[in-house]
Amino acid sequence: MAEMKGDPIPVSNQEKQQGQAILETILEAVLEITSGQRGPWIIGLGFPGLKTSDKKGIAALVNGPRMPTLACDIELELKKNQIDLATPIHALGSDADYCGLGEEKGKDGHFTGVKNAYYLGGGTGVADALKLHGQVLPFDQIKDWMAKTWELTSNGLSFEKVLSARGIQEQYARETKTPTHELTNQNFFISRILEKAQAGEPEALNVCALVGENLGLLLFERLETIFCGWQNRFQFINPNRPPLQSRHEYQGTFLERFVIGQRLGTALADDENSRCIWDKMVFTFDYLIEHSTHRELAENYTLRMEKLLTISSLRDAPVLGAAIDAWTNYRSQTHAY
């Protein structure tokens, strides 16, 4: 956090090694894409985490290293490999916002055809995206009245620790008293946990029920906050976070669609018949709707959960969003078409 305020923090050797591995992976991908083709090239990059003040680096990252000069490092490596860029990397965008942009512009995107939709992606972490009144809104633009999922806790448990693929693995490790690294070494991730639940294993069923309950809680809060304003339903990981405003310009808006993507979406798709996650999710959401003190909300959404929710198979949504943002920025600077 101090780094974002302009106070450089020495990056540890371990972080440097992790950052170098990420840099080499990016370089390898770019070299593969550009092999045998002529440039110059335009590159868009989306990353999780808090960005540096110039938006060219990562100042803080829950599941990875700080990389304060990442964009410049990438440009330097590309130059060494004679990869010409049409323009410098304009910024490291939000992978979450890019998910929304990809869902809006992608051929099979699920933000199309509706004016108001919420997206939740679950992978290494969690990603939020929101479309209101026909516009995809960056979450940083609405942070005064809506929190990102990773910021929120319920009953002392972080939503990211329950709804991300990595968090679900950690919950299963806790239930089975198995070290997380052992599960990773065995390739035991969310799909395997769901298979265990479908086979009736109590520990896996408990984890799936926990996922379903928290997903129902979160989706109701999103709907409620958009329609009514923040109701203090959850707590924050950071107790010093400024309070959310209870009023905003979009109040009275009904969400038309929930979109669940990435590995969490895949798990829900695989669970559609077995209902290990679905039943608890639907029950929790419907219960909150039925007991809502906001009459219009209750009238509009009673028994509608399954009609609202759709699963995205657009795993490339954030990549597509990054490309669109880079091209849009380039066009605005050069008036290219």
Each PLM stretch: what is its role?
Residues M1-G19, F188-A197, E203, P242-L255, ...:
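Extended charged low-complexity segments that act as oligomerization/scaffolding linkers
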Residues G49-K51, V62, L205, F227-S292:
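Glycine-rich phosphate-binding loops at beta-strand->alpha-helix junctions
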Residues S35-W41, Q82-T87, F111-G113, E182-Q186, ...:
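Short helix-terminating capping/connector loops at secondary-structure junctions
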Residues L45, L215, F258-I260:
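Buried hydrophobic side chains on well-structured beta-strands
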Residues M1-Q18, D73, E77-K80, D84, ...:
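Glycine/GP-enriched mid-protein hinge/lid loop-to-helix segment characteristic of carbohydrate kinases
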